[in-house]
């Protein structure tokens, strides 16, 4: 677990309640499109697809195929490294950079948003693969990844921009589960993979740590805390 930080980032909705008018704005996910959407994509490491009998299974994947409930398992970006646990791996990729189209979701103690329109952001992609010999039952959270720069001053995790157009342009999804896929547990069979991504402030050349938490599901689809695993990867954002 991380130690406490010197500053506190507050949700913008809470800041508004406290009367800090400078932080009103986007606190809930919404679909937006923007003519100013701009994505710069670094060289991508592609994994050749294996010969299969269906187009869906022919997508590039980290390992094996994609379960029916997964939105994607596509490998996008340049690999930063792999966080390896007992029976699973999470490959982490830096995908592309863009410009924030709106205010972020958090503010500092003075009421100033942490992310503002025009700020540079970077997209990363997480690919979870079952490397074990048995099915891996998962909850709705699938796998949690907490990314933080070494000099991140807040106790909360890093802020992000909720904009579906930016995610689409980057070629990543913000949710690993296809809508309407049913109830947990979601089974990840041996060799299967699932992917999702996120964005945060772009600080090129900055050391960053990715803390990965995987808590399998029990038969009812609830978190099985007795089997919780935490692993980490240290890298540098380009």
Each language-model region and where it sits:
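Bacterial Sec signal peptide processing site at the extreme N-terminus
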Residues: 26-32
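The feature marks short-to-medium sequence segments in extracytoplasmic or secretory-pathway proteins
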Residues: 135-188, 235
């Amino acid at each position: 677990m991380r130690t406490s930080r010197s500053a506190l980032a507050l949700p913008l909705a809470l800041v508004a309640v406290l009367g800090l008018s400078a932080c009103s704005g986007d606190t809930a996910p919404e679909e937006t499109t923007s003519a100013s959407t701009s994505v710069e994509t670094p060289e991508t490491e592609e994994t050749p697809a294996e010969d299969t009998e269906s187009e869906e299974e022919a997508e590039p994947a980290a390992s094996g195929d994609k379960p029916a409930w997964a939105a994607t398992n596509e490998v996008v970006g340049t690999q930063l490294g792999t966080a390896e646990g007992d029976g699973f791996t999470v490959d982490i990729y830096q995908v592309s950079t863009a410009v924030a189209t709106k205010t972020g979701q958090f503010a500092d103690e003075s009421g100033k948003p942490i992310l503002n329109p025009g700020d540079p952001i970077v997209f990363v992609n997480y690919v979870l693969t079952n490397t074990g010999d048995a099915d891996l039952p998962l909850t709705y959270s699938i796998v949690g990844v907490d990314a933080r720069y070494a000099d991140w001053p807040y106790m909360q995790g890093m802020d992000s921009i909720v904009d579906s157009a930016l995610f689409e342009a980057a070629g990543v999804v913000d949710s690993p589960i296809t809508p309407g896929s049913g109830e947990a547990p979601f089974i990840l069979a041996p060799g299967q993979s699932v992917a999702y991504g996120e964005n945060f402030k772009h600080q090129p050349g900055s050391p960053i740590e990715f803390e990965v938490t995987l808590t399998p599901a029990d038969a009812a689809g609830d978190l099985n805390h007795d089997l919780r695993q935490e692993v980490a990867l240290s890298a540098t954002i380009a």
